[in-house]
Structures are given as structure tokens and as C-alpha cells.
């Protein structure tokens, strides 16, 4: 079963886990409207995250525009412009192969790297199928926000299975 980041965050939120605020947009106009809703709560800095079933979205490239799959926007106008460069495009990451995956949805989220009054931390949590044993494996790490493959290679002790 594959779920998008926004769906996983909704599940965690339903269990009382405090998560980054965000909304799902399917058009650049919706992205701008939703970012305005977020900016009333915190700041104008917004993170736009392509929603595809693959990792490496931040370093991935949209074939048609050259944009990354995860970008920071500093204003509402920038949200709309950057959304145009992502939505409808084909995102190629190290996990998608050259064919990439079409981006139909965008997570419009608050920037958690702000210098605000609340402390913010990122973690990694994944449930994977170990194909060799046919068993689900839960992986967790304090090194959230980065490619977990890189953490596994450089600091395997930071991953709990």
C-alpha cells in the first residue's frame, strides 16, 4: 500500500501527533489560496511538496520545467508561480527511474524551519515490506527531513528497525 505524505500526516494528526500544518492543492490558484490561509497563522514562508509515491522529491527534477519537487516560497505570488512549475509535471527522482511520475497534487505546508517561539523537530518513520521475509518492517530515525538511504549508508546507528 502506498500513501502520500499528506495522507500519512493526516493519520498521525488523528492520533494526536503534532505535525506541520498544510493543505493539498491540485491547481496553482488553490495553492496560493491555501498558502494565504497558512500565512495568517504563521508566516509567508511556505513549502511546496510534490505528492508522488517515491522518495527523493526534494532533489528530484520536474522534466518539463527543471524545478525541484520540493521548494520554498517566500510570498503568495511565488507560491502560485512555483506551483505552476510543479503541478502537472513529471517528477524524476532516484526512485522513479527516467520515466518519472506525474504530479497531480501538491502539499502546501508551513515552513517549520522558521525562527519562531516553538521548537520544531523532524523524524523519519516508515513501514516497509521486507520482500525476502514477507514481513513488514517499521523503521524510525531522528534524522528526518533527509534521504533515509543516505542516513542508512553514513550513520546506520541512527536508524531503528
Name every feature range the model reports, one short phrase each.
Residues 4, 12, 26, 53, ...:
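Generic, ordered loop/turn and secondary-structure boundary motif
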Residues 80, 92-161:
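Hydrophobic alpha-helical hairpins/lids featuring a short glycine-rich hinge
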Residues 5-12, 41-61, 93-116, 125:
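ATP-grasp fold ATP-binding core
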Amino acid at each position: 500500500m502506498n500513501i502520500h505524505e499528506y495522507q500519512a500526516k493526516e493519520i498521525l494528526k488523528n492520533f494526536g501527533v503534532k505535525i506541520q500544518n498544510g493543505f493539498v492543492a491540485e491547481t496553482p490558484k488553490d495553492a496560493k489560496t491555501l498558502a494565504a490561509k497558512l500565512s495568517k497563522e504563521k508566516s509567508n514562508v511556505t513549502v511546496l511538496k510534490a505528492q508522488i509515491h517515491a522518495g527523493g522529491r526534494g532533489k528530484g527534477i520536474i522534466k518539463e520545467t527543471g524545478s525541484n519537487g520540493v521548494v520554498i516560497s517566500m510570498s503568495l505570488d511565488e507560491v502560485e508561480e512555483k506551483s505552476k512549475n510543479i503541478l502537472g509535471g513529471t517528477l524524476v527522482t532516484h526512485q522513479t527511474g527516467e520515466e518519472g511520475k506525474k504530479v497531480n497534487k501538491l502539499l502546501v505546508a508551513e515552513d517549520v524551519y522558521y525562527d519562531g517561539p516553538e521548537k520544531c523537530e523532524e523524524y523519519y518513520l516508515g513501514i516497509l515490506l521486507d520482500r525476502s521475509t514477507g514481513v513488514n518492517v517499521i523503521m524510525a530515525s531522528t534524522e528526518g527531513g533527509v534521504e533515509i538511504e543516505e542516513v542508512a549508508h553514513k550513520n546506520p546507528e541512527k536508524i531503528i528497525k
